[in-house]
A protein has these predicted regions:
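A short, structured active-site edge motif that brings together acidic residues
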Residues: 59-67
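Divalent-metal-activated hydrolytic enzyme cores
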Residues: 1-31, 66-76, 83-86, 101-179
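Structural motif
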Residues: 32-35, 58-59, 89-92, 164-165
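Short beta-strand segments
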Residues: 36-38, 62, 94-96, 166-169
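Gly/Ser/Thr-rich loops at beta-strand to alpha-helix junctions
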Residues: 40-42, 97-101
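N-terminal low-complexity or amphipathic/hydrophobic leaders
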Residues: 28-42
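Short Gly/aromatic-enriched secondary-structure transition segments
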Residues: 48-53
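Ordered, amphipathic secondary-structure segments that act as subunit-interaction surfaces
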Residues: 84-96
Length: 179
């Protein structure tokens, strides 16, 4: 049985036993907060617990590295939707210690992609710079500052939205603000 099959079996039981009832809320975040964070598995539960957030408090948006690599990427789109459709007035950017995105390199990805059967021609496409798109960052504080700046200076984010950046310690959950 695959992991997805196990999840589907669990889900049937979850619904049948009404496990969802304790999670019922509406689509509007109670704290008018959005959090852009890394998709790292260590933060799956730790992030909300360390921030004191419960289901329904905030919109949580996750990607590799908690970054805004382009003003028109899906994370930025989600933040814009959160502001205009869901009433968000504050945004937290939360990166974390020992982030794998610090060490990402296109060279590594390219090698792995070729091993897994991706044609070399796909990696040479001229419509996207895969080297830039898959390159990580090397300074977490600088990355947080760049992400905060990208949000604050986005032409569709109003000036009355507060945006602040943080680094969470991956093991303890301790937050440090990045100024």
């Amino acid at each position: 049985m695959t992991n997805i099959d196990k999840i589907l079996a669990y889900n049937r039981e979850f619904v049948a036993s009404k496990g969802y009832e304790k999670h019922l809320t509406d689509k509007f975040p109670d704290k008018k907060l959005a959090v852009l964070s890394c998709m790292d598995t260590r933060l799956s539960v730790l992030l909300q617990d360390a921030l004191g957030l419960k289901n329904g408090d905030a919109k949580i948006i996750k990607n590799a590295g908690a970054v805004i690599p382009s003003p028109w990427d899906s994370a930025m789109r989600s933040l814009i939707v959160a502001v205009y459709e869901l009433g968000v007035t504050e945004i937290m950017v939360v990166a974390h210690t020992t982030c794998g995105a610090c060490h990402m390199s296109f060279g590594h990805f390219k090698e792995e992609m070729l091993k897994r059967g991706i044609p070399a021609a796909e990696l040479e496409r001229s419509d996207i710079d895969l080297n830039a798109w898959l390159e990580g960052f090397h300074d977490t504080e600088k990355s947080v500052r760049n992400t905060v700046s990208a949000i604050v200076n986005h032409p569709l984010i109003p000036s009355d939205v507060t945006v602040r950046g943080f680094i969470i310690e991956s093991a303890t959950g301790e937050l440090t603000e990045v100024k």
